[in-house]
Amino acid sequence: MVSVFQETWNEGEAAMAEFIKLPVGIENFEKIRRDGFYYVDKTGLIEQLLNNWGEVNLFTRPRRFGKTLNMSMLKCFFEIGTDQSLFDGLYISKNKALCDAYMGKYPVISISLKGVNADSYENARSLLKRIVMEEAKMHRIIMSGNRLDDIDKAEYMSLVTGEMGEDTLVYSMKTLTALLEKYYEKKVIVLIDEYDVPLAKANENGYYDQMVLLVRNLFENVLKTNSSLKFAVLTGCLRVAKESIFTGLNNFKTNSILDEEYDETFGFVDDEVKEMLHYYGQDTHYETVKEWYDGYRFGNADVYCPWDVINYCDAHRRNPMLPPENYWTNTSGNDVLKHFIESAGAAKGLAKTDLERLVNGEIVEKDIREDLTYNELYASMDNLWSTLFMAGYLTHKGRVDTKRFRLAVPNREIRNIITEQVLALFKQDMEKDGQRP
């Protein structure tokens, strides 16, 4: 899809500014459209999702590739009471039959588990309860009128008081879907963003088994044999093994960076980047942007990291002479990379040689496992290669066979990040050696 920036949005404000604002750090679709920010049109995702139909759909992409913005867009499209003008001029608006059938027609439950980041299981569970409670409050309209009986209303109140026990918590989202279906007489769409963050944080802090059980029960209840469910979409960075938290979900479809379907719906493709650079008068920066931020291979598409491109354009609007930066590394830690480099150093062998080859722009061949659990990520060098690939530190240059891929560092930014981590750990080792008697 190409970019869309409508004159119909805040014409007076746009007239005062030389260019439409760039949405640096903004992941809310309604805000981007209503406040006149530059938007790269990804509404084709809606059409693909409905045409390829899956009752439960999981999308995995590295961080900062537009997952949260796409989920916000899905909510705005399907939710009852939506402002349909948000989609004026966008790709999906051309499909009038689809818009008439689906736009603004369904109750939507939308939660993000990004905030479930705690040092203990008890605190993580409290955070999860808070997220469910806040989402339930967004649907307080169902308490009006007499569509729900007193028992239904009591069930709803149990979700918004913040006093729910674990039994209530694991059934909370299923309960909310049932109440919404009864009120609206429509099946419910469920959106769960950053589904795997609670598992990642639990693994880091020593309560992984407890969190797996909680998340499995929560998801199983709302996603498996739930007669109130229209369909669900989940996003995350890694595809956790189905046996871990998606046990028994026969209605489950996954889409990863290796799949051809949806390969242009997360991240920017070349034409989108060229159009953005042209609009902001940065055509001469194209080769630099491509060298630094392109190089990812999703399905059959060559993809740029949108976070990098937007930040680069924004910075160079103010100062065209700025050198490129490693924008991606500043968004979170690089724990996966640190684990890998430390393990490669400890191995003193092939892994270290492979790392040197990658930094030098060469290709290595490795088997890739997509179905790891979080407590397996660092268990072996083979698993670490898979983790680096899925997390966006490596991309593929083609298959050798079903599970074996030709891997490479995607771009200069990632090469710099890897080099910086290697040098930092080398410096630590030198300092330790200097302290030894």
Question: Locations of the language-model features?
Answer:
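Phosphate-binding site recognition
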Residues: V2-P437
